Amino acid sequence: SLALVMDDPDAPVGTWDHWVVFNIPPSTKQIAKGTEPNGVAGRNSWGRTGYGGPCPPSGTHRYFFKLYALDTELNLPEGTTKKDLERAMQGHILAKAELMGNYKRGG
């Protein structure tokens, strides 16, 4: 299965988790704009499931998209935190890809 995490390590309160999704089918080739991939939604730093886009309070922030290929599906419930996901993935990561983008609020 696949797992996807998006976070912002430059948030004033520490790393802010924008998106946590796991048990994504490995056949997934893309995620269309405005959609969520098939899989189980974890909890972001707003305390909700699903994607929360970038909206930094000030300055330029780095946003990391981390995609993990796993050797199994994870037995975790919807709303799982990134910390619990990372713990469950230990020993199951086959490969990892990472993309970083910068974003600054306009105005």
What are these regions (language model features)?
Residues 1-107:
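N-terminus-centered regions that define maturation/targeting leaders and the start
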